[in-house]
Amino acid sequence: MKKLLISALALFVVGSVAAQEGLGETYNKAVAAYNSKDFASAATAFETLIDQGLDSEDLDVQSWVATAKKSVPVCYFQMGLTAAKGNDFNTAVENLTKSANKAALYGELQQERMSNMLMAKIYLMWGGKPFNEKNYAEAAEIFAKGYAADPKNMEMANFLGICYCELGDFQKGLVIFNEIASQDNPKYAEDVVKVKENIKLYTNNRIAKLQGENDFDGIIAVADEMLAVNPQDALAQKIRLQALFDKKDY
C-alpha cells in the first residue's frame, strides 16, 4: 500500500513539473509574439497562460500569470491602435473595448483609462463625417458612445450637445452643455467658452422663434427647462422674468 502511495506522489510531482514546463513554453511563446509585435498571437497565448496557471501555487507560474495580466490589455490596445490607423473603426473599438474590460478585470486602471481615451478619440473621428454632413442622428449615436467611454473628452461632449440641439432635443443638449460649463480645470477653459456660446446661440434661436409667435408661455417653458437643468442659470432667470413682464403676468 505504501508503495502505491509513493508511486502516486511521484506521478503527481512529475505531472506538476510537466505542467509547469508546458506553461513555460506558453509564456515564452507569448513573450516572443509580443516582442515581434504579433499582438493577436501574444494575447491568445497570454490568455491561455492565465486560464491554465491562475490557480497555480508555483512562484514562477504566478510571476508569468502576473505578467500576462499586465500584457493582455496592452495587446488589445495595440491591436485597436493599428485598426484605427487603417480607419477600421469597428475593429478598433472592438479591441479597445476588450482592452479596457481586461484592464478593469486585472486591476490595470491606468491602462483602462488609456484604452477608453483612445476609444473616445476614435468615436470622435468616426462621428465627424456624419456631423459635417449634418446627419445629426447618426453623429449623435456615435458621439454618445465616445462620451460614455471618456466623459472628460470635452470636444466630444460639445459635438454631442450640438447634435441633440439640432435634433430638437434642447434639454438633452443643455444637460451636456452644462456639464462642460461646470468644468473649472484651466485645461478646459476654451471648451467652456465655446459651450457657453452654444448655450446662448441655441437659446436665442428658440426664444426668437417663440417671440415671433408671441408665445410667452412657450418662452417661460424654455426658461423652466433650463432651470430644471441648472437652477442657478442666470440667463434662464432673465428670460423667464422678461417673458413674464411681456406677458404682463407679474
Identify the meaning behind each predicted range.
Residues 2, 18-97, 102-106:
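N-terminal leader/linker segments that initiate helical-solenoid repeat arrays
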Residues 49, 99, 146, 180, ...:
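Canonical positions in the second alpha-helix
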Residues 62-64, 71, 78, 118, ...:
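Canonical tetratricopeptide repeat
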